[in-house]
Design a protein with these regions (language model features):
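Alpha-helical transmembrane segments in multipass membrane proteins, preferentially the mid-helix core
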Residues: 144-149, 174-176, 197-212, 229-238, ...
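Hydrophobic cores of alpha-helical transmembrane segments in multi-pass inner/ER membrane proteins
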Residues: 80-91, 136-148, 193-203, 261-272
Length: 305
């Protein structure tokens, strides 16, 4: 005999959960619109959504850039940036004076980088664009994710594991650099732009995890400005070299202009925050992340090799 009370209770519980999901989603949207900082009382769902959204954004942009390639190759335009943020977080884990709560929250924020590596690893293995070096980079990124997520409480053992994770991360960086050897167009896979992306992502991870390393965060802002200037010089030098080659045809001067203008916008945003001594909010970092991650797209639109 059908238990109607059980059915109604199940339906009511499901409806309540769905209502809670909609409420939390609404709160997340309101946080984005208001530009609020991450609060201590923020629900776990919002923290998870705040961590997932930047990775989702990176994957969408990365695969869109992949689709624009004339000769598809399973090589991420943003993987070096994700490796960079993981290495920066390792510095915070090893050198930063953080409590177990902050360490745990930052470890959970790092866990979402594993999604980026899993998607790229499955894509590389499951398609005809298989790239062994990309597999190596993904495995290194996944190993770092697991180590930073499950950190032991014993200090010496934790430091040993984190240093091993740093060594694995450097192997991933070497593997990615080996993929760049045969690339004629460095601007699309610009290492300086990807390191800048990693610095912004690291700042974002610290904000999401409500970390109190104010000195380290301020240092990251200065590093972002330095790499933004370095990236601009790198791009201008490469454009000069490419302009001397008849094999390069500039097809969209507007995209090239927009690529360079984005540097000015990002420089202005960072400079205002530095001079006013403002902390970068989640919203500001998300805007910077979007602009930095989109640079490979504008580089692709600008010319065809």
């Amino acid at each position: 005999m059908l238990d109607h009370n059980f059915f109604y209770r199940t339906f009511a519980l499901t409806f309540d959960r769905f209502g809670e999901f909609l409420h939390n989603a609404r709160q997340f949207c309101l946080c984005l619109l208001q530009g609020n900082h991450m609060s201590e009382e923020q629900p776990k769902f919002l923290t998870a959504l705040s961590s997932f959204f930047p990775i989702f954004l990176l994957l969408v942009i990365d695969f869109f850039a992949f689709g624009l390639q004339l000769q598809p190759n399973a090589m991420s335009h943003l993987a070096l940036g994700v490796l960079t943020v993981q290495l920066i977080c390792l510095i915070a884990f090893i050198k930063g004076e953080i409590c177990n709560g902050q360490r745990s929250r930052l470890g959970l924020a790092n866990l979402y980088f594993g999604l980026f590596w899993m998607v790229w690893l499955l894509f590389s293995l499951g398609t005809s664009y298989h790239n062994v070096f990309m597999d190596l980079v993904c495995l290194c990124g996944l190993a770092m994710t697991i180590i930073t997520w499950k950190q032991p409480f014993e200090v010496k053992l934790r430091h040993v594991l984190l240093k091993i994770a740093g060594f694995i991360g450097m192997l991933g960086v070497i593997g990615y650099c080996l993929m760049l050897v045969d690339e004629e167009n460095f601007i699309k896979f610009n290492p300086a732009a990807q390191i800048l992306l990693g610095i912004i992502l690291a700042n974002l991870a610290l904000v999401i995890s409500r970390n109190r390393l104010k000195g380290f965060i301020a240092l990251l802002m200065l590093a972002a400005i330095a790499f933004l200037a370095l990236n601009a010089l790198f791009v201008l030098a490469n454009l000069f070299i490419l302009s001397q080659q008849s094999a390069v045809v500039f097809t969209n001067e507007f995209a090239l202009l927009l690529y360079l203008l984005l540097h000015l916008v990002m420089a202005a945003m960072l400079a205002i925050h530095v001079f006013k001594k403002w902390a970068l909010s989640y919203n500001s970092l998300l805007i910077l992340l979007l602009m930095t991650a989109s640079l490979p797209l504008w580089a692709t639109f600008a010319y065809l090799p």
